[in-house]
Amino acid sequence: MFKTVGASAIISYNNKYIFEIQKSDKWNYNSSGEIEIGIGCIGGTIENSETPLETLQREVLEEISTNIEIIKWDHPFTVTSDLNVYDINPKNESRNLFFHWFGTKEPYRKCRICVFLGKVIGDPFPDDLLGVLITDIKLLMECLENDFSLNQCLEKGMKIISKEEIPLKAKIKEVGTVKTIRELYKNHKRRIKHLLK
């Protein structure tokens, strides 16, 4: 048996996507002493008796000060803790679930995150985040693959909306749902091809 512990969304905004820039207490230093900043999807932990969609709506409002429209989707799939991908029955899941993924390490192998597709309503501004990254998924995958810094990402055409200064020399790394998107991009691209246009 598994437990649903969180919800996140791949959120479109002006023909690109919005990704969170993690808070400084989650930054790491690599072996070269460079700061590594996690890039993830907007979302968070389920609280009390919330549904995944209720969690997502709350987190979106807290993190980017706006709401989202959930995009209709009826072909959900799962990414297992062993990184296998399978179709799942939409009747057994939250309405409009895009996919869910499981942790790859104990004790999280039986914990899942529900992922939805969304479209931002209005203009996002980081509230409970330092900033957000605006980019297309292909470019994000290229920058992650090449171990780029935020500055190099900006030179490639990404945009940052921030409320505090963020060290642009910091390297980016995928976390949470973005880590799963990267796995899908590498090995199961057909599952996300509609996001790559």
State where each predicted segment sits.
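N-terminal phosphate-binding loop and adjacent alpha-helix
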Residues: 48-55
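N-terminal strand-loop-strand
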Residues: 1-42, 53, 68-69
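Short catalytic/ligand-binding loop motif for oxyanion handling, primarily in non-cytosolic enzymes
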Residues: 27-28, 78-83, 124-127, 143
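Nudix hydrolase/Nudix homology domain
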Residues: 35-37, 101, 107-197
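Active-site segment of metal-dependent pyrophosphate-handling enzymes
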Residues: 65-122
